[in-house]
Amino acid sequence: MTTLRLLISDSYDPWFNLAVEECIFRQMPATQRVLFLWRNADTVVIGRAQNPWKECNTRRMEEDNVRLARRSSGGGAVFHDLGNTCFTFMAGKPEYDKTISTHIVLAALNSLGVMADASGRNDLVVKTPDGDRKVSGSAYRETKDRGFHHGTLLLNADLSRLANYLNPDKKKLAAKGITSVRSRVANLTELLPGITHEQVCQAVTEAFFAHYGERVDAEVISPDKTPDLPNFAETFARQSSWEWNFGQAPAFSHLLDEHFTWGGVELHFDVEKGVITRAQVFTDSLNPAPLEALAGRLQGCQYRADVLEQACKSLIAEFPAQKGELRELAAWMAQAVR
């Protein structure tokens, strides 16, 4: 019986692909070696311990319909589009060894005519007249009896968009958590004009087969029908949830301030697991009562634009004379936390 398994996703949904990865990883026999190939449409993927409000321009992402996906491995934030090819290698212990999967990817690149080297813990780089340029980044996860190595290969990614989403607004945000390190990157199309996702997948697959001396047929994973994977529906629901993607952020504090025609406002939030644990409101408004009431309404709310906006508007019934001010405040607050 073969010990290899090859899976290829035809979905561009990051939550679907990460849920597939998680399910395969949890249920694979310890004797199996798995290669999973996939790619995502416009997505910022953050590490397990990262804070999306600190790492990303969440407002710009929402405007441009870019998804946020939190992965189960550590490391930094990356932007995925269809110019990235994603790979995941899985194996049971003691056989799991990320140097083996790194060797397979390097062999695949070599077969395409690209000489790359491993650099540091996570990157593959190519030498250019301008110095080393990163063409692949990776992250890893291990449990007691198994491990995986997943990463991306930059084929024809829109590198100009990296800065759009991975540079957060200059918010007054004091946050804990892992900060991403920006690297100089290059697309493989600069070295191999016309290279395609399919060609790269084929090269990685052949290198995978060659290393283990076996061949297997590919299993195509599609969202058109629920994959036959244990607990997939529950895993997908969690992977796509606000509670996982945003709510798992490390604790942080956020200060918002604005001056309106009716007075200045400062909001101080402490946020844990995506929920406001403390809210303070300061104002020089001549009628501070609605704002004092707002602090109590916000405590315990999810740190979401729509939730905060609704909490503010809910005070209109209690303070109808300040309807205009409360609507203005609600709109500003929703925009400020996006």
From Swiss-Prot:
> Biological process GO annotation list?
protein modification process
> Pathway, according to UniProt?
Protein modification; protein lipoylation via exogenous pathway; protein N(6)-(lipoyl)lysine from lipoate: step 1/2; Protein modification; protein lipoylation via exogenous pathway; protein N(6)-(lipoyl)lysine from lipoate: step 2/2
Q: Which residues form the BPL/LPL catalytic domain?
A: 29-216
Tell me the NCBIfam families matching this sequence: lipoyltrans (TIGR00545)
* Organism of provenance: Salmonella choleraesuis (strain SC-B67)
At the top level, the lineage of the source is Bacteria
Annotated protein name in UniProt: Lipoate-protein ligase A
Q: Does the keyword Hydrolase apply?
A: no
**Which one of the record's GO molecular function terms can you name?**
lipoyltransferase activity
Give the PROSITE patterns listed for this entry. Answer: BPL_LPL_CATALYTIC
List residues binding (R)-lipoate: 134
The GO cellular component terms are: cytosol
The subcellular localization recorded is: Cytoplasm
InterPro entries linked: aa-tRNA-synth_II/BPL/LPL, BPL_LPL_catalytic, Lipoate_ligase_A, Lipoate_protein_ligase_C, LipoylTrfase_LipoateP_Ligase
